[in-house]
Every structure is written in structure tokens, then in C-alpha cells.
Design a protein with these regions (language model features):
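Active-site microenvironments in enzyme catalytic cores
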Residues: 1-12, 21, 31-252, 256
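Surface-exposed flexible segments
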Residues: 17-24, 302-303
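A short, sequence-level motif marking secondary-structure junctions
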Residues: 22-25, 32-36, 111, 262-267, ...
Length: 339
């Protein structure tokens, strides 16, 4: 399934809902479940749907496999109705199925935590070669990652701000894994069963600020935490595969800049999740980025985006994630006197 979070306009203002992409439609899963329960003769279908298939992605992930099973039943029920040219309605006449153009797709979830790895060897080798040194042997000991700002999330077709303190704005084309079950001290094999699915991540970067931070052995901080692109949907493991190997492409203003394979990672998802879980708990809704593939960023390509450019990441099975790059405010420099 392709799970989404979407916004629908109502007379009471915009509502945010959990949905699934089906053909050219977006199905409201909570209301589809309520319609199904009403069809089965349940006395309180809305209350049952809210308990078993809540309309919020994080609450849905918290319920694990049972909620996923209910989502499949709800989607099948809605699809069967559409196949008979009879769009299902909620118990109070609510609209269950929407045209894609009638809703606004948001980021599929608000991550509870965000970690981003450095899992592609060729990209890592290139990064150290640029600095005039060889890749540290410790890179091969265990997967390296940093913790990002999980609150600065930009969904599909949003404008991403250009920080006033950078002249080297960049993108990084990545796939992200979404955790679906709580786990701690997981083995590599156990970790696979804790994956809810995958989505596309654009790890936006201020390269000049990153250079300053990393030179002091800290960060990235301001070099990364201003924006992360996420979306358009959360594709479940059965559809994407537990160790997805998909073509990923970078398009800028309609021009293909680069392409690669997501499966070229040095580290597997099972190992990366297992590593994070050692003496630390993973929670549903945690998001882990893979890091970018070689030539999956402007730095590797030695090409830079400009204000107003449109950056689009396309990944087989996962969809397309587009963002417009905003215009910077007056240039500032983050350099201070002591105090």
C-alpha cells in the first residue's frame, strides 16, 4: 500500500487525514473502515474505526500490524465499491474517496525522531578525497549517522527556504525507512520485522556552514537542520521490499542530473536499524535516512541549484518528491563576538 497524510478543506476548516493512494484517488482509510463496519452491521462503526484504524499516521503506526490489516480491508472495501461505480460513504454520509487534485498531500508523517546515515561507500570515498584524505578505517566498523531536526519537515510541492547564511545550498537524494514497531537490542534479522515501509527523503544542506561545523568535529547542525523533504507516501514493505533496490533519479528544472540504485548501499537496512537499537529504543514513527548515493547531490556533481529552481527526486515504486527552492533573505554570516 501507498499510505499518505492528506489535507481536505471543509466548512470547519482544513482537516488532516490518513489515506491510501488507489488508482487516481485518495481513500480516507478511517472513513472507509467506518463504512465497512456499518455495512457489516456494527452498532458504532465510527467509534470502532477510530479505535482500530485512527485517522493519524503516528497513531496508526502505534497500533502495528493489526491497524495495517484493517487498512487493507478498508482499501479493498472502498475499491470494490468504486469498481461497481458506487463510491462508499461514511456512516453520516461523509466522503470516503477523493480525487488526487481535490486534496493536498502533506509529508506522510511527522517523525518522532530523525537519523540520517552515510551508507554509500562511493559517496563517502568522494567526500574524504575532496578533503585530501582517505576514508577512515572506522567507517567500515559500523554505520555512521547523525540526528537531524525532526520538526523541520517539508512535504511534497512545498517551497523550501534558502537559509540567509549559506551560498552553497544543496540537495541529497535519499530513501528513508520508517520504523513500525518498538524495538531494542535487535538482531539484523529482527530489525527487518520492525520496518513499516519506505519513503523519499531530500536531505537539504548548506555546504559552507557544514564545512565550518565539521572542521570543529561537531555537527552537522545549522548546515542541515533548516529543512528536510519527506514524501510523497509511505510505501509498505510488501510493496517496496525489505531491502529495496530501486532506481533513483534527480531532476532539476525538468533536466535529469543524476541517477543511481538505492540498493548500492554498503550497509543494509537490517544492520542499520540493528545498530541504532543497541542500548537504545526505536519507536514507531522514527525515520532513518540512507544517506545519498554517489552523484546524488550537487556537491558530488559539482553543480549547484539556484533560488527558484525545482528539485525533483524520483524513485521507482516510491513516487516523486518535488520542492521549489525559495529565495534567500538578506545574506547574513553566523560569526559572533564572544559573549
Amino acid at each position: 500500500m501507498k499510505l499518505v497524510t492528506f489535507e481536505i478543506k471543509t466548512v470547519l476548516g482544513p482537516f488532516t487525514r490518513l489515506g491510501a493512494l488507489w488508482d487516481k484517488y485518495v481513500v480516507d482509510l478511517n472513513l472507509a473502515a467506518a463504512a465497512r463496519f456499518a455495512d457489516l452491521g456494527q452498532l458504532e462503526p465510527r467509534r470502532l474505526a477510530d479505535a482500530l484504524l485512527p485517522p493519524d499516521m503516528l497513531a496508526f503506526l502505534d497500533l502495528g500490524r493489526d491497524a495495517l490489516a484493517e487498512a487493507r480491508h478498508a482499501l479493498e472495501f472502498a475499491a470494490a465499491g468504486m469498481g461497481k461505480n458506487r463510491a462508499p460513504e461514511g456512516p453520516r454520509g461523509e466522503r470516503v474517496v477523493h480525487g488526487r487534485d481535490d486534496v493536498l498531500l502533506l509529508a506522510p508523517l511527522k517523525p518522532r525522531a530523525l537519523r540520517d546515515f552515510f551508507a554509500y561507500e562511493d559517496h563517502a570515498l568522494k567526500a574524504w578525497a575532496r578533503a585530501g584524505s582517505s576514508l577512515p578505517a572506522s567507517w567500515y566498523d559500523h554505520p555512521m549517522y547523525f540526528k537531524g531536526n525532526h520538526r523541520e519537515i517539508y512535504g511534497p510541492d512545498r517551497e523550501v527556504p534558502w537559509p540567509s547564511y549559506t551560498r552553497r545550498f544543496d540537495f541529497e537524494a535519499e530513501v528513508a525507512c520508517v520504523v513500525g514497531r518498538t524495538g531494542r537490542n535487535l538482531s539484523r534479522l529482527q530489525a527487518h520485522t520492525h520496518i513499516a515501509g519506505f519513503t523519499i527523503l531530500n536531505d537539504f544542506s548548506a555546504r559552507d556552514m557544514m564545512k565550518s561545523e565539521l572542521a570543529c568535529g561537531m555537527g552537522p547542525g545549522k548546515g542541515k537542520d533548516f529543512a528536510y523533504g519527506l514524501g510523497p507516501c509511505l510505501v509498505t514493505v510488501d510493496e517496496a521490499g525489505p531491502e529495496e533496490d530501486l532506481e533513483i533519479q534527480v531532476w532539476v528544472n525538468g533536466e535529469l542530473w543524476s541517477k543511481g540504485r538505492t540498493g548500492d548501499r554498503y550497509w543494509s537496512w537490517g544492520l542499520m536499524l540493528s545498530h541504532v537499537s543497541q542500548e537504545e529504543t526505536l519507536y514507531p514513527g522514527d525515520v532513518l535516512g540512507s544517506g545519498t548515493f554517489f552523484r546524488g547531490c550537487g556537491l558530488d556533481l559539482e553543480r549547484w541549484v539556484n533560488p527558484g529552481d525545482e528539485v525533483e527526486l524520483r524513485v521507482d515504486k516510491l513516487g516523486s518528491l518535488r520542492h521549489k527552492i525559495g529565495k534567500p533573505q538578506a545574506q547574513t554570516r553566523l560569526k559572533y563576538e564572544r559573549g
